[in-house]
């Protein structure tokens, strides 16, 4: 057992923590020992002195303690972090297809009891994002352990790239930066920022330095397959295409034509590159999706009979959910107005704050206003390498629906 400074929490926080939720807010702390520094591991106790868990302490954050262990006998040394790495990796090896090991989320924060940490594997490159100060302090022990775990399982690692260029780090009192992680386990001569991966039989070039988030969105892996199954012979419009993943899967599935839109020039160029290297016919175009859909509606243009809506999160806060609701409703309404009877709509939200019930409400309102009836074909969530903890609703964020206009 490790001797740690103590934090005593309220009864309400104790019940939440014992129920499996790892976050303790500053307002829920009754007492904290003197001398605790930001990023320290603390022992969390109830007002009666009962052990609740061990967690990262950060007074600069609203989430003041992030519990990551409920075993009072844990010692937080290199061996502990390597065990955590092994547990996360072995879960993926059990639930994912073998062909997905080279494009897989290895660590999904709280769902892996590693608060604020994301690790994606793109071939032999790891892309890492650290959003909690405690994990930043223990990053070296964990990442070195992770590299060893992967190599022990014959999974190569040539370099690790840190994508810590996100503003949310400042809320934890950390600086933004990006660059290669250096370790005696890694050869600087092997460093690279672009790597090719294969997902669902399609080759992509991933830019871990400049791509969105960690470089590529892995959470829609199986949703793309579902979308492709009904695309044969269809004229498809893929909105917010990013690197073209939905467009390429549907094109591979036999679509008659595929147009992929994104407001980002870099995204459009990467989509065109990915289409070319796979020998797939996809027209990649730079456009504002809202304006494009509005213009099609004005022209009464019904040439597309399958539309994919995979927008970025319109809200990252509960405070802006109402504005996000309007944004989601607007694009879904426009898509429904454009689609002919018998056409298909794939629509998604990647915001936790836009919950499943609220998203369904939005879809129903959009359909009512567009004067259409929807037939639900399928509902899906994020891929299993992004696991959902039933006690931590924040780990559930991705909703994916397939509808037909009837």
What are these regions (language model features)?
Residues 1-123:
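Non-catalytic accessory regions of SAM-dependent methyltransferases
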Residues 243-256:
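Conserved SAM-binding loop of SAM-dependent methyltransferases across substrates and taxa
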Residues 233-242:
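Conserved class I S-adenosyl-L-methionine
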Residues 266-308:
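S-adenosyl-L-methionine
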Residues 303, 330, 344-406:
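C-terminal catalytic and target-recognition region of SAM-dependent MTase-like enzymes
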Residues 257-262:
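Conserved SAM-binding motif I beta-strand of class I
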Residues 304-334:
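Mobile active-site "lid"/loop adjacent to the S-adenosyl-L-methionine
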Residues 107-120, 140-216:
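Non-catalytic substrate-recognition/targeting regions of SAM-dependent transferases
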């Amino acid at each position: 057992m490790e001797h740690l400074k103590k934090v005593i929490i309220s009864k309400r926080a104790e019940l939440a923590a014992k129920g499996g939720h790892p976050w303790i807010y500053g307002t829920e702390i009754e007492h904290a020992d003197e001398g605790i520094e930001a990023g320290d591991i603390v022992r969390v106790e109830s007002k009666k002195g009962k052990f609740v868990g061990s967690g990262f302490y950060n007074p600069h954050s609203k989430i003041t303690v992030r519990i990551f262990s409920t075993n009072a006998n844990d010692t937080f040394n290199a061996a502990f972090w390597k065990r955590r790495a092994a547990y996360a990796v072995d879960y993926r090896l059990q639930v994912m297809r073998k062909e997905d090991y080279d494009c897989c989320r290895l660590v999904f924060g709280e769902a892996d009891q590693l608060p604020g940490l994301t690790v994606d594997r793109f071939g032999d490159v790891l892309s890492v994002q650290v959003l909690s100060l405690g994990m930043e302090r223990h990053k070296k022990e964990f990442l070195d352990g992770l590299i060893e775990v992967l190599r022990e399982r014959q999974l190569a690692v040539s370099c690790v790239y840190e994508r810590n260029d996100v503003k949310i780090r400042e809320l934890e009192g950390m600086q933004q930066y990006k660059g290669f992680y250096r370790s005696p386990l890694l050869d600087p001569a092997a460093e690279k920022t672009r790597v090719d991966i294969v997902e669902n039989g399609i080759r992509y070039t991933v830019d871990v330095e400049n791509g969105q988030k960690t470089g590529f969105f892995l959470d829609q892996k199986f949703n793309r397959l579902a979308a492709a199954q009904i695309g044969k012979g269809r004229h498809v419009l893929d909105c917010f295409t990013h690197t073209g993943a939905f467009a390429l899967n549907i094109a591979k599935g036999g679509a008659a034509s595929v147009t992929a839109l994104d407001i980002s020039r870099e995204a459009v160029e990467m989509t065109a590159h990915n289409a070319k290297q796979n020998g797939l016919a996809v027209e990649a175009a730079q456009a504002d999706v809202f304006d494009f859909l509005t213009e099609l509606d004005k022209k009464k243009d019904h040439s597309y009979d399958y539309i994919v809506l995979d927008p970025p999160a319109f809200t990252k806060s509960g405070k802006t959910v109402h504005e996000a609701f309007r944004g989601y409703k607007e694009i879904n309404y426009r898509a429904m107005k454009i689609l002919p009877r018998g056409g298909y709509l794939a629509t998604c939200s990647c915001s936790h704050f836009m919950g499943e019930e609220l998203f369904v409400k939005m879809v129903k309102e959009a359909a009512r206003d567009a004067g259409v009836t929807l037939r639900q074909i399928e509902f899906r969530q994020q891929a299993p390498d992004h696991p959902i903890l039933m006690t931590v609703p924040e780990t559930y964020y991705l909703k994916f629906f397939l509808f037909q206009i009837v």
